[in-house]
Amino acid sequence: MASADKGLEEIQEGQIESNYDETVDSFDTMNLKPELLRGVYAYGFERPSAIQQRAIMPVIKGHDVIAQAQSGTGKTATFSISVLQKLDPNVKQCQALILAPTRELAQQIQKVVVAIGDFMNVECHACIGGTSVRDDMKALQDGPQVVVGTPGRVHDMIQRRFLKTDSMKMFVLDEADEMLSRGFTEQIYDIFQLLPQSTQVVLLSATMPQDVLEVTTKFMRDPVRILVKKAELTLEGIKQFYIAVEKEDWKLDTLSDLYETVTITQAVIFCNTRRKVDWLTDKLTARDFTVSAMHGDMDQGQRDLIMKEFRSGSSRVLIATDLLARGIDVQQVSLVINYDLPANRENYIHRIGRGGRFGRKGVAINFVTADDVRMMREIEQFYSTQIEEMPMNVADLI
């Protein structure tokens, strides 16, 4: 058992200690099945992120793995790629079970598995509360190789024998801290008892409270531990600048001037409100700039279309609220402009991380009025980073 193991002594830190530091910095050298590799690149990944470089290989090799990482680090793709590599598409039975704390996250994971596994002929079913039990039963009888779901519904389906566990090789717990804090502990323990003894366990968690550590000691064998720290993740390779703007009204002219100076391959401009997004889109369009806009008032179909145009490069500048900042990988973004500084520090990393995400370089420019200076200092402190005044030669950096 892992309890005597050194990393778990640091419990009060709430942080595990890595015991594994091998990295693989290209998807090509991971020995992935050709049809999986094709799916990885088709999905838009170019280089593995910090967690993907460390965690994919030990999972593929069959180790139990604990990975401590925040959201927005590419962790969903980490276990999706590993699961797809290990399962046998010809066996029409559930081989991997993935648990998530919320229905939304479970559906998001399902989309990623389906997208990356696009060329592999595998089925992935989302087993979540709030949907028809009958539909679940029917889908599970077809034997999807991957089932992703919330603990309550998954537990129910296993107990009713619709979700069969005999062929399960892998059990993934995503956002384990969230699941346990939401009171799913009992169901999770029950599910563990119902899986084959030899099942490989992969646990991902942003924090490592006592209850998560207990799960790791009880149910994991000699786990590989991987800690991906916040700063290492997202601000690496990203140059951050600010432009002092005397008052709010002058931001628009500042943005127009910036357009003149810089050739933008692709940029995202963040505003704090939907109204501001629409206003800025109108103003820039009136000045003959081509921009597209996206926020939460739009329906999913509209948003998908806008993202598709942006991904393909037919639209070059996207103006958005924080809705976009989480979980969307746009590989070619070279520039992120915070027209408004985010209202909370956590969103800063989600916005900026876009620019240099997954090993790409990027530039972030923050428009800062006198009212924003305190927030900017807080952001610098929180991420132990520096945001410097934008130099004249900024065009050379993008």
Curated annotation (Swiss-Prot):
Organism: Botryotinia fuckeliana (strain B05.10) (Noble rot fungus)
Alphabetically ordered keywords of this record: ATP-binding, Cytoplasm, Helicase, Hydrolase, Initiation factor, Nucleotide-binding, Protein biosynthesis, RNA-binding
GO BP terms: cytoplasmic translational initiation
PANTHER family linked to this entry: ATP-DEPENDENT RNA HELICASE DBP3
SUPFAM superfamilies: P-loop containing nucleoside triphosphate hydrolases
Record's protein name: ATP-dependent RNA helicase eIF4A
Cross-referenced SMART domains: DEXDc (SM00487), HELICc (SM00490)
EC number: 3.6.4.13
Subcellular location: Cytoplasm
Complexes and interactors: Component of the eIF4F complex, which composition varies with external and internal environmental conditions. It is composed of at least eIF4A, eIF4E and eIF4G.
Span of the annotated motif Q motif: 25-53
Residue interval(s) of motif DEAD box: 174-177
Coiled coil: none
Sequence ranges assigned to domain Helicase ATP-binding in this UniProt record: 56-226
Domain statement: The Q motif is unique to and characteristic of the DEAD box family of RNA helicases and controls ATP binding and hydrolysis.
UniProt lineage: Eukaryota, Fungi, Dikarya, Ascomycota, Pezizomycotina
GO cellular component: cytoplasm
Reactions performed catalytically: ATP + H2O = ADP + phosphate + H(+)
Binding site for ATP: A69, Q70, S71, G72, T73, G74, K75, T76
Gene symbol of the encoding locus: tif1
